[in-house]
Amino acid sequence: MSSKLQNITVLGATGSIGVSTLDVIRRHPDRYRAFALCAHSQVDKLFEQCVEFRPRFAVLRDASLAATLSERCRSVGLDTEVRYGVEALIELSSLPEVDAVMAAIVGAAGLEPTLAAARAGKKVMLANKEVLVMAGELFMHAVREYGATLLPVDSEHNAIFQSLPADFARGLESCGVQKILLTASGGPFRNSPLADLANVTPEQACAHPNWVMGRKISVDSATMMNKGLEVIEAHWLFAAPPDMIQVVVHPQSVIHSAVQYADGSVLAQLGNPDMRTPIAYAMAWPERIAAGVEPLDLFKIARLDFSAPDFERFRCLQLAYDVLREGGTAPAILNAANEVAVAAFLDGHLPFLGIALLNEAVLQAMPAGPEGSLADVLAADAEARHLAGQLIRQQRFA
């Protein structure tokens, strides 16, 4: 066990991954310190976290929110320095004092600080899949060039990481890997009549059967866009060609993913659906620590079911495979369109089935370019968001 206290910057501290990360830190105060806590706009929740964990820094979206938090911290004698904006996120992901960064900001907003952490050679615990979806080539190049340690936190990719040999970077085929089996619950609508999907409400879409998640990722799970993004993420994390990544619908969410080998073996990681398990694994790797998760009781499982995904029902999953094969900025365009589509659905401005239709319309209208630089990626992201917003305002899919 390492005797050095690890300073951790938590990007997305008030979200579900951030809260679970802080729970693991709470259980191991002799190993980890919450050095910087970064959130979007939840002042009350971030203040409570600052009181408990006493970070050196806290970050919020804008100056007004930061001023409110700063005043509240001073009123209780906290010396936490409160900052705001993207530049603060970038700085607190790359300071020399920082040992590890939990990258858990949802969506494209997490790209720049997570890339900064990689370029600073940090241990990057990656929960933000959009970083690899938008800029996989740039990000993986930074990880290699600057000697960062990259550990996946998504339960599926963490399971794959655990099921691969330690030297998988020399090439999956060289390691005897035939397939990466990426499991998916199928979301709340996997068995719903197709006619019923036209009337799905945000509340129904956010009611995931197995996992406790934020609203955006819950909707992505319901459309299986989440799994599509994870296919792209797996491609970059493990240098796996698209045809090597097979999505398997597994409603119980007990097998978190698996790897099929040339000798007929299939190695899988099993566990109760609790994000503290992959978080604790990433934090302590290559060691293992208690995560507060109830052990899996094999006698209570009773059965495990598996099926192939329905690409007609889950059009977003097919779109993800399509943009992965196309390459360049196509994945960034899909991600941007989807973020706008999901936000519109949650706000009542787009029907559930309109999410996939809008994503496809943006991809058809906007040609992909090369992923040459961060500026290219951000420009494609901005253009796709603008186009998606226009289509929604025109009520093309109402």
Swiss-Prot record:
Metabolic or biological pathway, per its Swiss-Prot or TrEMBL entry: Isoprenoid biosynthesis; isopentenyl diphosphate biosynthesis via DXP pathway; isopentenyl diphosphate from 1-deoxy-D-xylulose 5-phosphate: step 1/6
GO BP: isopentenyl diphosphate biosynthetic process, methylerythritol 4-phosphate pathway involved in terpenoid biosynthetic process
SUPFAM superfamilies named among the record's database cross-references: 1-deoxy-D-xylulose-5-phosphate reductoisomerase, C-terminal domain, Glyceraldehyde-3-phosphate dehydrogenase-like, C-terminal domain, NAD(P)-binding Rossmann-fold domains
Keyword Chloroplast included in the entry's annotation: no
Keywords: Isoprene biosynthesis, Manganese, Metal-binding, NADP, Oxidoreductase
InterPro entries assigned to the protein according to its UniProt record, in alphabetical order: DXP_reductoisomerase (IPR003821), DXP_reductoisomerase_C (IPR013644), DXP_reductoisomerase_N (IPR013512), DXPR_C (IPR026877), DXPR_C_sf (IPR036169), NAD(P)-bd_dom_sf (IPR036291)
Binding sites annotated in the UniProt record for NADPH: 14-17, 42, 128, 130, 214
Known catalytic reactions: 2-C-methyl-D-erythritol 4-phosphate + NADP(+) = 1-deoxy-D-xylulose 5-phosphate + NADPH + H(+)
Pfam families noted in UniProt: DXP_redisom_C (PF08436), DXP_reductoisom (PF02670), DXPR_C (PF13288)
Residues involved in Mn(2+) binding: 154, 156, 230
E.C. code: 1.1.1.267
Enzyme class: oxidoreductase
GO molecular function, one term: NADPH binding
Cofactor or coenzyme needed: Mg(2+); Mn(2+)
Binding-site residues for 1-deoxy-D-xylulose 5-phosphate, renumbered to this chain: 129, 155-156, 185, 208, 221, 226-227, 230
Protein role: Catalyzes the NADPH-dependent rearrangement and reduction of 1-deoxy-D-xylulose-5-phosphate (DXP) to 2-C-methyl-D-erythritol 4-phosphate (MEP).
UniProt record similarity statement: Belongs to the DXR family.
NCBIfam families xrefs: Dxr, PRK05447.1-1, PRK12464.1
The name this protein goes by in its record: 1-deoxy-D-xylulose 5-phosphate reductoisomerase
The organism's taxonomic lineage, starting at the top: Bacteria, Pseudomonadati, Pseudomonadota, Betaproteobacteria, Rhodocyclales
